[in-house]
Amino acid sequence: GIRDDLVTGVQTCALPIFKKIIIFNYDSEKTEHPYISLETILNNNEMDETFEEFPFDHPIYILYSSGTTGYPKCIVHGAGNALIEQMKELILHCDVKENDKLFYFTSTGWMMWNWLIAGLACKASIYLYDGFPFYKNNDCLIKYCEDHQFTLFGVAAKYIDQLKKEKFDAKKYNLKNLKTITSTGSPLVKESFVYVYEKIKKDVHLGSISGGTDVVGVINICNPFNSIYAGEIQCPSLGIDVDVFDENGNSTKIDEKGELVIKKPFPSMPVMFWNDKTEDKILNAYFRKFKNIWHHGDYIQKTKNGGYIIYGRSDATLKPGGVRIGTSEIYRQVESFDEIQESIVIGQNYKNDVRIILFVKLSYQAKLDDELINKIKKKIRINCSPRHVPSKIISCPDIPRTKSNKIVEISVRKIINGEKVDNIEALANPNSLEFFRQLKIDD
């Protein structure tokens, strides 16, 4: 919630190819650097509209994956490839129309910013907020939505979960133009679907969506013409041949969990990986597990409603007794407790098997005593299964996360199992790992 002056930092980081840096809502007397104001540009009618033509797949974005599963991938995306995919998602799936107002709670380092920019091609206006979403009050973003009458309000699932936990009621705000809320970053649980319709807006299209930096877009997405089922993503994105495979590469039955795959090429596949002349990196990233099939790395289930439920990253799944358990199944139960602010769950190698270790970051003044531990275990046992119940529940001061706000189960798992963690520069709070390095878990 601390305000900071970024102008000097921008000047320091400016690349030689930058001709001008644009600022707005800033007192020009505070800086000696050569800037041009946004107002000056908007008031200038002398526009040079001569643009150089490039091939459809000419590189436009270099994006780095979040680093939750290892070193970040340096992914190059093509201009036309990304744009046609994103416009399809916005116009056909999210019902974006000319003169709409689109907002996404994202930093410029997350691919949702690139997705938001495509709104301009849909003749919509776009709005950005980069900062703490509860600055001063928990209504910060909702008030922003009201003030500008957004038609699409895009946020992370964790943001909705936190509003629900704080019992925030948005019904007093004027959100008359809001027609779509999209949620991404992690699975949106059933209870948060219910919360949105009860406490934010009852006649809104709530779309849980999932894709990634790898495709600079969405794979499973919302559909304004279909029914919404709490906890489910409505459908695959149009033109993307989504399926769920078992470990042997066979399609799973309805309601069986497996690996998210794409069986045919699609427009927004990466043009290449940077510094990958042999294409070994890109092939290893997506095509090694199943021959000629894109393996996305999500643990997922197709439902009888035609939708999908994502249970977490495939390589973060828990395997006690050899049975795969998605991490989101446990998070849904644990984070319903007011005493728990956030949690992270991993599998620890133990006596030729794997046991589940749950770490919890407590809410202010909450205490992890035997009573709370037993309540957590009981809820997990009743709503999931005895296999889901953690062997240990441990309080931790902070949850390690990437700069795009994704928790890093794999890094914590490696530390607990005595393995080296290489990619700490991808973390927003690398010092949080020190607690886990010093931890000794007894029997």
Where are these regions (language model features)?
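AMP-binding/adenylate-forming catalytic core of the ANL superfamily
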Residues: 11, 146, 153, 266-267, ...
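Conserved AMP-binding/adenylation subdomain of ANL enzymes
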Residues: 83-101, 111-151, 166-168
